[in-house]
Regions:
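Conserved RNA-binding domains used in RNP assembly and mRNA/RNA metabolism
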Residues: 1-98
Length: 98
C-alpha cells in the first residue's frame, strides 16, 4: 500500500517511469505532487518534469489502474529528486568537519 508523503518510483501502463511524492491514494485514483520522468541520456539518467505544461504547485491525479509497479525510491535518486523539485541540495552523510 502506498504511504502518504513518501517518494515512490512508479512504472505506468505505457511503460514510462515517474518519481513523485504521494499525497493520497484509494482504489481508483492516486494523487501525487512534483512528478518527474526519468529520461536516459548519454550522460546518464536525467529527471525532467513529467508534465511540462502543468502548474508545478498543483497536485496531479492518476488512475490507480495505470500503475503497474511501484517501489520506494532509493536514497540517491531521492536526493536528486529533491534537488530537481525544490532546488535544495542535500549534504552527503558523514561526520561533520571544520
Amino acid at each position: 500500500m502506498l504511504e502518504k508523503d513518501k517518494i515512490y518510483s512508479f512504472r505506468l501502463s505505457d511503460s514510462s517511469e515517474i518519481i513523485a511524492k504521494v499525497i493520497s491514494t484509494d482504489s481508483t485514483s492516486t494523487t501525487i505532487s512534483n512528478p518527474f520522468s526519468l529520461i536516459p541520456t548519454p550522460q546518464g539518467v536525467q529527471l525532467l518534469p513529467a508534465m511540462m505544461s502543468a502548474d508545478t504547485g498543483k497536485n496531479v491525479t492518476i488512475n490507480t489502474n495505470n500503475i503497474t509497479m511501484y517501489v520506494e525510491t532509493n536514497k540517491d535518486v531521492i536526493a536528486s529528486y529533491i534537488q530537481a523539485s525544490t532546488g535544495i541540495v542535500t549534504a552527503p552523510k558523514g561526520i561533520l568537519k571544520g
